[in-house]
Every structure is written in structure tokens, then in C-alpha cells.
Amino acid sequence: MSGSRNNRVMVEGVGARVARGPDWKWGKQDGGEGHVGTVRSFESPEEVVVVWDNGTAANYRCSGAYDLRIMDSAPTGIKHDGTMCDTCRQQPIIGIRWKCAECTNYDLCTVCYHGDKHHLRHRFYRITTPGSERVLLESRRKSKKITARGIFAGARVVRGVDWQWEDQDGGNGRRGKVTEIQDWSASSPHSAAYVLWDNGAKNLYRVGFEGMSDLKCVQDAKGGSFYRDHCPVLGEQNGNRNPGGLLIGDLVNIDLELEIVQSLQHGHGGWTDGMFETLTTTGTVCGIDEDHDIVVQYPSGNRWTFNPAVLTKANVVRSGDAAQGAEGGTSPFQVGDLVQICYDIERIKLLQRGHGEWAEAMLPTLGKVGRVQQIYSDNDLKVEVCGTSWTYNPAAVSRVASVGSAISNATGERLSQLLKKLFETQESGDLNEELVKAAANGDVAKVDDLLKRQDVDVNGQCAGHTAMQAASQNGHVDILKLLLKHSVDVEAEDKDGDRAVHHAAFGDEGTVIEVLQRGGADLNARNKRRQTPLHIAVNKGHLQVVKKLLDFSCHPSLQDSEGDTPLHDAISKKRDDILAVLLEAGADVTITNNNGFNALHHAALRGNPSAMRVLLSKLPRPWIVDEKKDDGYTALHLAALNNHVEVAELLVHQGSANLDIQNVNQQTALHLAVERQHTQIVRLLVRAEAKLDIQDKDGDTPLHEALRHHTLSQLRQLQDMQDVGKVDTTTWEPSKNTLIMGLGTQGAEKKSAASIACFLAANGADLAVRNKKGQSPLDLCPDPNLCKTLAKCHKEKSSGQVGSHSPSMINNDSETLEECMVCSDLKRDTLFGPCGHIATCSLCSPRVKKCLLCKEQVQSRTKIEECVVCSDKKAAVLFQPCGHMCACENCASLMKKCVQCRAVVERRVPFVMCCSGKGTEDVADDIAGGNIPALQKDKDNTNVNADVQKLQQQLQDIKEQTMCPVCLDRLKNMIFMCGHGTCQLCGDRMSECPICRKAIERRILLYSMSC
């Protein structure tokens, strides 16, 4: 049977499109995570030949260890007769069949499944080949997607290993562009690529058909996303990879003693104090990871990863047993049995259909233990639980197993086997075990005694760990020093690739880091997830260990297997203190992870304003704020897209982000905010004077987008809007304050595309600009009354009646900024510290705990009095860095020191800016030289100067990176083994690196592109 199955896999697998699998260990042969290749042939039942889209061809394992996953088997021609994809109507389904486990007779093909068709919460069965065992998968909503890359539409290609089409491409080495993925034949979908060559020729070429690869990509393209862990492993018989016979959905217990569990957990997720709940509670298997470890979910909602040897399948009644009981007329339960209610709400809702149904009042009973009161004729159970009684499907409960002699014997036998398994790999008896345990417990005398014995291995392992690693994680410095005297290997790795320094970082042992550093340990060592000790310390939140590692010159910007640097991890963990320390140590903000996000992008995506504030305050080069992802998105695009208002405000005001940068679709941040109807972001960008008439790739302006999203139902809602009008739409006229100052702060207008459109028109958006279809914004407006309103708003703006720069508008703006944000009756007269904002009057300020403008904690409140110099006007200028406001505008311009504290004035902030309005910050150096900036300075000149300044900073940055740090005259063209470099002339004269002072072991010359 096994031989015939292997032959079948070999025949049916040729041509499949594959990606790297769970046991991959071949670096970037494939081009990286997500890159795709084609199964060319099978050398044997254990080996398969794959040609990657980048042209690399090699043998990979498909038995015992599994290097590959099948992303799409449609090119092989495998078809499921009698089936049809219920989305795209493909009939029959060719390739992998995905069958919904929660709907009747609902199937998807691979393209639709990975394209998120049907309900993402529903679980699916994966059926790889007709008649094969179906595998139940986690819902897609809970699963990770990665991007496929390779020969897809947009890729640049040359001829590949199976090319046989003479000079259709114009000759060897000539390039072309893939325009579409097509079918080579009706029975082999997605097995060919249509290419337009640079010489003008175009044709269809094989990419998977019968295992052939006519093309090789020199510049890959994205091919959509796929659920990596849902793809079958090439060559594996059981898609669940279920060690110990455990399947997803099984209920499991832990029947072992705590010490044994902790020993078995080494290298399998470890043990923490929070896991004590698992010793007395039944959990459900919810996943099996790539290392064959079991992920178990508990009634508390926590998920823990276990060594499969720790778990025992619970003695429970499953739905199949219940069904058999029903047919036989007897129930597997008895009155008085103690049962535990299923805690998976989605599952129990499904099971309760036709069995008493589900009620929201049953929610508190999930995961609780109750007693069976009655068994109905259809075997449904009446259970007393949480002081009430409910009817349950017998499949929705599990009987709490009693402790009997048979179970005790089985447990004793199992314990014996586990103990044997735990230590069966130790070659030198029990000495290694004793050494590791003594090191973990800090028993110096016993460790010293064991090390004197000739037959002990100082690097021996117990449960996958050495004595060095155990002592490091537990902070036993004396034992570490003792082990170092006996020439212990400080770089020994455990199953996960973690070294002693990783364990020290995990255990928050800064002193151990010092000892290991003196012992020659590599502080930049990486484990199998490519994590350094710094990654681990940041993820665990160990600030002192982070500082210690950085003090020892640990590299602050190395990337893990996901491409994340410690900066990314600090942002994810919301540790601003660690983030600041990393930035002070020179962490590189510009490094991007595998998804293309640098630290600024990551903070914007996460909506983390405190992290963004730290990043912007310590940004080494201001122009980094406008760095783009590969799709053209800047941090401001991401904040606008996800409606992270505070982050966007920081980027605009503190980061001075360019508001008009366009992504690959030529959309600005304003396009995205209008498209998603994020009114606060729209108001922010327009107030900051973003350009309103930039066109995207379709020629649409933000006003086109606003009117496209406008519907007649939204027009009807506008009739009741407080700030737009209180009569019917024929007399609807938006108030000028609403249109210019914002979109209102409450009511339905916040989500109204129509009010956004009026706001844009009132601020000068062009009503006549046409998109590529020849449509103006008014052509997209279905309501003539709204068209008239838009035209009127635009006309008033053009004539200056509603202009943002008109005197009336400035007065309105000033009045709005001066009124208290709480009561709106009195004027603002209280300065908040330490942020320096003015938001309320003195009567309302005691009630405000956080600043209404920046959300920072208010630590001080100072009422603004009259100018201490002239006593004629109120104080209206905030001095920085002292934070005092004690002088009016005229007097403040003459001061070099604060009259209140005598601190040097570095910057002056006008009253209007403290109220979050617009103004000009005075710089002390300019004032000292007599150059006081004018409030009405031309905006275009300011933008030009800012752009020139950014370019100068970029040029200076490039010079610093490329010039010799010694002579500062010649280009850097010699690199040392430490990673630093100089010019050749300086380098030849040195015996130690001028940067880190390490001895120069070897010199490597660099060559420019012109050499």
C-alpha cells in the first residue's frame, strides 16, 4: 500500500506549484519565504526535483522530513469529478478541493479559497486528491497569509531550463514581461504564462505544465497571498502531522507530575507560571505547529504550546459516539455524571441547532462543569450548571473522567515510558542529567564535584539543554564561572538554536550577560528564528538586559526570520522606554521587514502614537518620515488608511511629513482618507494645506472619490444634519464654519461622503478637472441640488467670500481656537504641562486629566497672566525648553533668556500654535541675527526651502556613509572583518580599526560599478 501510494504521489505531483515547507533548511535557494517553484520530477519516493522561478534547480526531501508545501496543484491536472467551485463555477474543481465544514455542499477551488471567498470564520476540509483523507483546518480568519512571489503578472523573465522555442524572445538573455497567467490546456489550469518580449513578440510559455519551466524570472512579481499553513506538505500522508495520534479538536489532559512536564517542555515552548491552569483543566487541540508541537486552548482563552509527550487524550464522548448512542436507544451518559461544557462559542452554537438551540444567557456556562439532571429520549442532556439548567447536545459536553485503578496503572506505565524517553539519548549515563540539574538549581558544590570526574561531558545535554544554558537562564553566576574554567562551549545550541546568551536574555539576567561577554560569547548570535539576544530581551520587556547588551556594542538592528528588528518588536510590545534606548544606540529606523514596513511604517500601521512620538523626536534624518514601502505607501498613507488620527497629527505637525506623496496607484493620503470616509483625517490634511486636486492612476481627485461614495440614502440623512441644514435638500446650504473649520464633531455628518465633498469644494477643490474616463466630479454627483451646493461653495471660495485666507475666516478661526474646548463659553487661559498646550479655561482645567489635544497626562496647570514686562497685553509666547509663558509677542521677540527662570530661550511658540492652530515657530538663532520670520511668509517658498534642506541632508548622509572616516577626503573602499572601513591609503597604515579598536585581521577592497 505504501509503495503504491508513493508512486501515485510521484505521478500526480509533477507540475505542482510549491513553496518552502515546514522542514526547510536551505536558506534562500528558493529566493525567500513565499517564493514559488515547479515540481519537475521525482528522483525517488524520498526526493523531488524542483525548479524555482528564479532558475535554481535542486533536490528536496519529501519523506521523513518535508521541505515543500503544495501551493497549487491545478497544473498537475488532478480533478475532482462531480464537484464545482461555488464562487467561480469551475467544474470540475482541478487541483486541491476545499470543502466548507459548516455549510452543506459548499466547495471552493484553490484560487477562491486563498482569495478569501466565503466566510472567513468557517472551517474547511482540505481534500488534496479524489478519495484522499480530508483534513480539517483552522478558520482562515485565525491563520497567517503570506505573499506569493515569482513568475506572475508583472514579472520580468528570460528563457528558462526547458526553453525550446528558438529565438522567439529575440535571443538568449533577452527579457520580457509576464502579462497574465493562463492555462496551457483546459485540463491543466494556471500552467502557463503569457509574455510580451522587449522585441515586441508575444506568446504563451509553460510554467508547470508537465513539470516544464520555459521561463526564469530576473525580477519577480507578487502573485496574491496564500494561507501557508493550510497548504498540504508534499509527500506527507497525513496533513495534520499528528504526533501521538492527536488531531485538531481533540480534548487533552496533562496527567504527569509538574517536574516531568517542565523537563519535557524544554525546547517545546518552555514553561511559565501562567501554565499551572493546564495541570487541572481539559483543553482542546487547536493547532499543530511546524515543529510537531501541539497548541492547546483552555477555557480561560489562553493558548499554550506543548511537547506532544506531555498530553493525554481525554476520556470524553465525541459526536460520533453520541450518534451511535442515539441509534441504539441508550445514552453514554448517566444521571449524576459531572460534565464540562464546551468553551468554543462558535462550535457550541453549531452543535446546539436542533438540540435546545443557543441562547445568549448560556454564555456564562462555557467551559464550566455541571451535573447531568435528566437524559431525554433523543439523548439530549439537561445539565445543571452555574445555578441554572439548560439543554445541551451530548456532543457539546465532555464527561469528567473518574480516577480508577485502570487509569492509575496506565498513567504509571506512561510515566515510566516518558522518563525513559526523556533520558534515553544520553550517552554517558546519568552524569549529564545531574550536571544540568545541579547547574539549574545553583548547586555549586555538586557541579564542582561532577566536573572533577573524568567521564562527565561539560557540554552534555539533558532534555535538550546544557548546564551552561540552564545556569544562564537562572542567573547562577558562580556556576558559569566554574564551567568557563573547564572550557565549556559558550556557543552550544539547543533544539531551537538558542545559546547561553539567549537564555540569559530570556531570564532577565544582566550579570550573566557580562560574564558571557568576558567569556567570549557572541552577543549577536542568532537562533533558528534568526533572533538575537536583543530580540528576546525586547520581546520579554527586559529593559536592563537591553541596556546591558547595547553597552557591550550589540548590533541594534539585526533582523529575524520575519525581517523584524528590535525596533519593530519594541513598537509591537508598546515599550517606548526600550524604543528610546534602541534609538539612542543608533538603531536603524529605515530597515524594512519582510512585509516592507520600516519602524515608522510599523508604528503608523499599529496606531501607536507614543511610539511615533519617540521615533520622530529621535529621527536621525528628517526626510526618513517620507520613506515609501514597495507599494509607495508612506507612514502618513498608513495612518490615513487606518484612521489613526493621533499618529497622523504627529506625522503632519511634528514630523513635517510631505502631504502630497503618491503611492503606486498615485493616491495621496487624502485620497485614502476620503475613500474610507475618515473625516478627522480629511480635516487634518486639508487644514495642513494638502493639495486637493492631485489625480490618481485613474485620474480621480479626492473630490471624485467623495462623490463616488455618495448615495441617495446618504443625501436623505443630510436633511437632519445640524450643521448643514434643517430644511429639505432644495434649500440646503452648508454653514461656512462647518465647511472650512471641519466636518463637524458629532452627528451623521462624520460619515457622510456628501459633507466631505462640500468641505473639499469649500476649500478650493476643482470641480472641472476630469479623470481618464472624461468625468468631472459633478458628473459623478447624482443629485442636482448637491451639484448646486458644490458649485456655490466653490464659487464663494474663488471669490474670497469663504476663503481660508480672507479676514473673516481668520477671525472665525482665531475665535474658534481661543474658546474653551470644554464649556465653549470662556476663552482658553490655562497652560498644560509638560506638553505646552492650551485647551481650556481656568474653571474647566481642574477636570481635565489628559490634554485634549495630545492625550498626554497633565502634570501641571498654569493660568496665563499679563505680560511680566509691559503689563499691557496677555502673555502669548511659550518659551522652550523651559515651558514658561510670561511675555507678549512684542516683548518675547526681544528676549534671549526667560525672565521667569533665566533659562536660555531656544524656541518660541506662539499662542495660536499652543492651541493647535497654525503659526510660525521662532528659532532663537534667527532672532539673534535679526531675521524674524514673517507670519505671512509665502508657503511655496517655504516648501521649496524645506525640499532643498532635505536634499542637502540626504547628500550629507550619503557623504558620511561613503567617505573615509579618518581623512574625510577620499571615498571608503576598504572594509575590515569587524565591518568598519576606510580608504585604502589610511587602511594600509593601520593595525587596528579606528572605529571599534579591534585588531585588523584582514582587509577587503571594494570596487565601484565603474571598475
Curated annotation (Swiss-Prot):
A zinc finger (ZZ-type) spans 80-132. Residues 6-74, 143-221 form the MIB/HERC2 domain. Keywords: ANK repeat, Coiled coil, Cytoplasm, Cytoskeleton, Metal-binding, Notch signaling pathway, Repeat, Transferase, Ubl conjugation pathway, Zinc, Zinc-finger. It is found in: Cytoplasm, Cytoskeleton, Microtubule organizing center, Centrosome, Centriolar satellite; Cytoplasm. Zn(2+) 1 binds at C85, C88, C109, C112. Its EC number is 2.3.2.27. Zn(2+) 2 binds at C100, C103, H118, H122. A zinc finger (RING-type) spans 820-855, 867-902, 964-997. One of its GO terms (molecular function) is ubiquitin protein ligase activity. One of its GO terms (cellular component) is centriolar satellite. The keyword Zinc applies. Residues 936-963 form a coiled coil. Pathway: Protein modification; protein ubiquitination. One of its GO terms (biological process) is Notch signaling pathway. It holds the Pfam family MIB_HERC2. It catalyses: S-ubiquitinyl-[E2 ubiquitin-conjugating enzyme]-L-cysteine + [acceptor protein]-L-lysine = [E2 ubiquitin-conjugating enzyme]-L-cysteine + N(6)-ubiquitinyl-[acceptor protein]-L-lysine. This is E3 ubiquitin-protein ligase mib1. It comes from Xenopus laevis.
